[in-house]
Amino acid sequence: MNITRARSLALMGSALILPSCGGKGGSRAVRVGSKNFGEDITIAEIYAAALEHSNIPVERRMNLGSTQIAMAAMQRGDIDLYPEYTGTALIDVLHMAPLHDAKQLYQRVRMQYQERYGMTWLQPSPVNDSQGLCTTQTVARKYGIRTLSDCAKAAPQLRLAAIPEFVARADALPGLQKFYGGFRFKDVKTYEIGLQYTALQHGDADVATAFTTDAQIAVNTLVVLRDDKHFWPAYNIAPVVRNAALRAHPQITGVLNAIAPLLTDSAVRRLNLQVNVQHQDPADAAQAFLKERYN
């Protein structure tokens, strides 16, 4: 692990201290976008700051919206790259059946994006930000729920606090209902991302949607329900880049591939704590993350 980290730091250091060899005079700025939640915004800010350190001009277009909105912006050419999750791309964008081998999933997504959209998936990070459902210790004991199978059966007695995408995405509630059966909740209410945890803590819900790198899980000692039938695939994050941007700025690949190994589960949980709980600005958290690792 230390050898890998040292090698990653060396690679990133060499990438980030490149002179302006990639910044062609008059080249259009690379437009870096993100989806509309703290983790994606923060990682996009890390990508943007790393590119700027390598003298690649950057324009930020953060907080665009859902997966569909970000992908539409890529297809129109409104943005040149953004962070995406392998499982989300496979199921929600490509509408393909889940794959549970993370490497096979990445290769499938990489090939399909190249063929369908003329977009390149760069190196994925080890962080796996899977979807999930969580509850409080009290509710888990009261209803005897520790797994998704338990929750599927108990759902008619439970109120769900969900982010808006969860009620419609194929890899979310509709998929759970089809795959596990059940999951017919007593009540479903949608909240802005992050506020589902507030509803859970205030007793306005019994179960909430979660991402496994969310800092609120540890802060509030929540119970993440085990995916005992293995519904969800891997959700490794990687930069998705329009081929036209790579042709204009080929050094993007080296810069962002050097970042990839540093985005581990623990590193991303720490970033999420800083941004989503301690309310740091994502750009500030990103700059501190890079400074800590290559200075």
Regions inferred by a protein language model and the residue ranges of each:
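Ligand-binding "clamshell"
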Residues: V93-K103, Q107-L122, H202-D204, Q216-H230
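Bilobed "Venus flytrap"/periplasmic-binding protein-like clamshell domains
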Residues: S27-E59, L64, P126-T198, H202, ...
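Alpha-to-beta junction loops
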Residues: Q75-E84, P156-L158, Q201-A210
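A bilobed periplasmic-binding-protein/Venus flytrap-type ligand-binding module shared by bacterial periplasmic
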Residues: Q131-R141, N236-H249
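Acidic helix-start/capping segments at beta-turn-to-alpha-helix junctions
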Residues: M62-D78, T86-I91
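C-terminal motif of bacterial Sec signal peptides marking the signal peptidase cleavage site
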Residues: P19-S20
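An extracytoplasmic/periplasmic, membrane-proximal ligand-sensing/linker region
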Residues: E39, E165-V167, D171-A172, Q177-F179, ...
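N-terminal secretory signal peptides and thylakoid transit peptides that target proteins
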Residues: M1-S14
